[in-house]
Each structure stands twice: as structure tokens, then as C-alpha cells.
């Protein structure tokens, strides 16, 4: 009996020593690889064994040697958009990846307004979803959703699978990401791969490493797994479980829709978001890749017991746009929902993110991608004159040459509704209640349906003062 056990143990050990090449789930059949790049691929094999990698697009065989733990990594020169292709890996036993496309790859991250699927949430639909899901079939649009995972230490793989876009897969996929990818497909004419790593209600801090959070002492880093009281809000927990495993997956850029959870902690958001983006760029080692994000949409946050005006968080997102290189912000002042934190118009969110990518990353001319932005204010007697930048097509109101969302205040810091009229790229603001204005605010509230535009895009809420309230 003992001899039989020893023989079985020896056979098991021999089998373990000759492990087949295995890959993280992100590398699997149906994947999209970034075209015209040196695309990273990594996995496990037999320890200290040469792994041969054959690629179908150039009939070349590459070799890489695994380390003592069996880990290996390699960068493949990828061709222009097209496919399908195959990759075969062999360390004595073959592993084959099939139906691979070359195209444009984007990471899509954030909280619930990124996670929200095309089918919507219960009682919370996506506008036009029924017909858009019906017409969603596109074999060259590939989707990968990373399953929620909150961990104390970084993990090496994720749960998910690559799927072609069709009504069944798109119904369960991020609406914001889908509409973004759909626009890229239609305008670039190449395969597109979308990787969604998002968790509703998640904090910005959760998507960051501990060393990036040193400048933010209020972010309490967990010292043990027991310290993860909130899976989606604990600092570092989602970076460890949902981002770290795909760091290095060669891609074009990132889209981000987050901020609602940070409203009550708004003063640090611009700096924190900047630190997060810089951190992601440092670990990805792809230089200053594009980072485009949605400004949170207006919503009455008092419904969820927030006492902080969310316009302060929108202001922080405006500041972040100036701090972060190679970025852009999609303004959603006209696409909110007063009594719902999950706006229905995800087609608008996806379109405006796509405008940024198509214009700023892919160089498509003739489209406006960035909203006009508050520049400065001057006071002439009882009238404030507000100027804007990025307003080549001047300013207009939803109902003509006026806006109903301006307020002015004097030295008493009390704001009063004001008359606002538009002349070219300036807005003139005046209130009979404030003979000597010193500050102006536009739509600076939790909920406001933005009514100020330039060249088809809404202008963010803003203020000219720096008062605490």
C-alpha cells in the first residue's frame, strides 16, 4: 500500500512539474489586442522552461523562459487592425488562443454609472435601450466585464470572458462603455475591445494603491483583511482585486465615470484623481495614455441624505481637467435626473466620451469634443460680465440668448437669482437685489438642468468665488 502511495505521489509531482501553459482570463479566445503596438502577454508554465509562442499574423516563433515560479511575460509586435488571428504557446504542451482581433482597446472604470448595464437597474431604465439592444450585433465589437472582487492584497487574475457584441451580451454590459465603443466602431471602422472594471458605489480611494494615498491621511489603508468593512469603498481594495490583475494589458486609453461617492469628501478630489491617474500611468508603463472621464450629472443628493452641494465635486472635476495631462471631461449638465442618481441618457455619456477620443486621440477634425469653460469675470457697476474659453462658436442658451440659472452675491455672501443675457461669448448678469455684485454662480446646485451651451455641448456649473458655502 505504501509503495502505491509513493508511486502516486511521484506521478503527481511529475505532472505538477510539467504544468501546461496557463494564462489570466483576460488573455482568452475572442480577445482584442491593441493594433500596431508591442502588446504584453503573460502567464504561467513549467518552472525554468522555454515557452515557444507562435503567432499567425507573421508566422514567427518567439521564445521566452519562465522563472523559478513558472511566471513568464513577453511583448508581441501586433499588426494593423484585422483578424481573426491565433496565438499558440508551447512548453511541451500546447495552449491555443483563437479568434483574436487586432484593434483599439479601452479600459472602462468607475462606479455605478459606468457599471450600469444596458438593461438598466430595477426601476431604473436606460433610454432607448430596447431598440439599441435589438440592433447591437457586431462581431468586431468585443466586450469583457471583470467580476466584482475586493481584496486585501493584489491578485493576479480576474473572472470574466470575452464576448462578441450581440443582444444577449450587450444587455448585460455597461451602457456608458457600450455607447462609447459603438461610436468608435462606426467612426474608426476597426475592431474595438472594451474591458469594464467597475463597481457601483465605489470610492476613488478604492481604485488606488496605498503609496499613492500617502498625501491623503483621511484615506485609511486596511492593515488586515478584517479592516475591509466596505468592499467597494475601502482604499486599495478594488485596485488589488479588479485593476492590478490587468495592469500592463496593452491598450489605447481609459474612460472613467466616478465621483458620486466622493461628494462628501470633495475638497481633495482633484488632487486625488490626479494622483490616481498618475499612478495608473506609472504602473502601466505606456506613457501618458489618454484618460477621459464624465463629470457627474446633476441629481438631488438630499434624497440620499447628503448635506454637501454636489456642485463642489463637479468643480473639483473641472480642476482635475487642468491638472491631468492628455485628459478630457465630458460635461453632463443636460443629462441628469433630478430624482435618480443613475441618469437614463447613457447614450449621451458614451457619445461625449467618444467625441473626446475621436478628436483628441484619433485626430478626427470637424467635431467639437470639449465644452466651453468659465474663464473669468469682471464687474461693471451692478453688472457682472462672465467670459469663457474654448467658445469659438460663442455661447447660447437653451431658450435663446438668456439663461435662468445664474445667481449673484454681494459682500454679504447671499446669492440672489439674476437676469442673465448673452452677447457673443460673454454672459451679462444682473440682479436688482444686489447693486454691487462680487460673485457669480451658474447652476451651482445639486440639481439643475443646464441651459448654457456652446457648439452643441453644455457648459459645466461654475462659480467665481472661493467661499466655503
Regions found by a protein language model. Give the residues of each.
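Bacterial Sec-dependent N-terminal signal peptides
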Residues: 1-22
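Cell-envelope and extracellular/periplasmic
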Residues: 20-469
Amino acid at each position: 500500500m505504501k509503495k502505491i502511495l509513493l508511486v502516486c505521489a511521484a506521478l503527481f509531482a511529475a505532472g505538477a512539474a510539467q504544468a501546461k501553459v496557463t494564462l489570466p482570463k483576460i488573455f482568452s479566445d475572442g480577445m482584442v489586442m491593441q493594433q500596431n503596438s508591442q502588446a504584453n502577454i503573460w502567464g504561467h508554465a513549467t518552472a525554468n522552461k522555454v515557452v515557444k509562442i507562435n503567432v499567425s499574423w507573421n508566422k514567427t516563433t518567439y521564445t521566452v523562459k519562465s522563472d523559478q515560479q513558472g511566471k513568464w511575460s513577453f511583448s508581441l509586435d501586433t499588426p494593423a487592425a484585422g483578424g481573426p488571428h491565433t496565438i499558440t504557446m508551447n512548453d511541451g504542451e500546447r495552449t491555443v488562443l483563437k479568434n483574436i482581433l487586432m484593434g483599439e482597446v479601452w479600459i472602462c472604470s468607475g462606479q455605478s454609472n459606468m457599471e450600469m448595464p444596458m438593461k438598466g437597474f430595477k426601476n431604473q431604465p436606460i433610454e432607448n435601450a430596447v431598440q439599441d439592444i435589438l440592433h447591437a450585433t457586431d462581431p468586431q465589437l468585443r466586450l469583457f466585464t471583470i467580476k466584482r472582487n475586493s481584496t486585501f492584497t493584489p491578485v493576479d487574475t480576474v473572472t470574466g470572458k470575452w464576448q462578441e457584441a450581440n443582444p444577449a451580451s450587450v444587455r448585460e454590459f455597461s451602457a456608458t462603455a457600450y455607447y462609447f465603443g459603438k461610436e468608435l466602431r462606426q467612426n474608426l471602422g476597426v475592431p474595438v475591445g472594451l474591458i469594464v472594471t467597475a463597481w457601483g458605489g465605489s470610492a476613488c480611494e478604492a481604485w488606488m494603491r496605498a503609496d499613492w494615498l500617502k498625501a491623503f491621511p483621511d484615506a485609511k489603508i486596511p492593515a488586515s483583511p478584517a479592516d475591509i468593512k466596505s468592499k467597494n469603498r475601502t482604499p486599495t481594495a478594488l485596485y488589488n482585486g479588479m485593476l492590478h490583475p490587468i495592469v500592463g494589458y496593452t491598450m489605447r486609453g481609459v474612460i472613467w465615470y466616478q465621483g458620486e461617492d466622493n461628494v462628501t469628501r470633495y475638497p481633495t478630489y482633484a488632487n486625488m484623481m490626479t494622483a490616481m491617474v498618475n499612478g495608473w500611468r506609472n504602473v502601466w508603463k505606456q506613457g501618458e495614455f489618454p484618460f477621459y472621464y464624465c463629470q457627474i450629472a446633476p441629481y438631488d443628493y438630499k434624497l440620499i441624505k447628503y448635506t454637501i452641494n454636489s456642485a463642489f465635486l463637479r468643480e473639483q472635476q473641472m480642476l482635475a481637467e487642468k491638472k491631468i495631462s492628455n485628459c478630457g471631461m465630458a460635461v453632463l449638465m443636460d443629462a441628469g435626473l433630478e430624482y435618480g442618481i443613475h441618469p437614463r441618457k447613457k447614450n449621451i455619456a458614451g457619445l461625449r466620451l467618444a467625441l473626446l477620443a475621436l478628436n483628441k486621440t484619433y485626430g478626427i477634425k470637424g467635431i467639437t469634443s470639449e465644452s466651453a469653460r468659465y474663464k473669468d469675470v469682471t464687474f461693471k457697476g451692478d453688472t457682472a460680465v462672465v467670459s469663457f474659453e474654448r467658445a469659438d462658436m460663442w455661447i447660447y442658451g437653451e431658450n435663446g440668448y438668456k439663461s435662468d440659472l445664474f445667481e449673484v452675491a454681494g459682500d454679504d455672501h447671499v446669492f440672489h437669482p439674476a437676469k442673465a443675457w448673452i452677447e457673443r461669448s460673454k454672459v451679462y448678469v444682473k440682479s436688482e437685489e444686489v447693486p454691487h455684485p462680487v460673485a457669480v454662480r451658474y447652476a451651482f446646485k445639486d440639481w439643475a438642468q443646464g441651459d448654457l451651451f456652446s457648439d452643441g455641448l453644455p457648459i459645466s456649473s461654475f462659480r467665481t468665488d472661493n467661499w466655503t458655502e
